[in-house]
């Protein structure tokens, strides 16, 4: 299983198989963009993001002591909100601040007929959590979802 976005200049995402679980990975010119793309990959692991309308906005505040833990907190918060609100999101905006981030996600209530759900994440696995910056300054953020 591999599902990828077209690689754009400022960001891209992919969904990949990780044993019986699914991994999501975001790439960007900034950590914020990589986190946005990883969240978009989370949506793509569940449904076609293009089928999700941007009717409602949900705001997030996340804090952690490292980039990897911040990614886990961020993706975990998105998973929790998707579940609690029975929503899918198709657009994300992340802004870093000190040891955390603020974010917005745009989406709509779940419509199982139109959204054609494929997988449902219950959380983040301990393995596979990584946030890194390469020598050219590009960021990658990845985690493995418990399915």
Predicted ranges, named:
Residues 2-27, 31-147:
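N-terminal intrinsically disordered, cationic/polar leader segments
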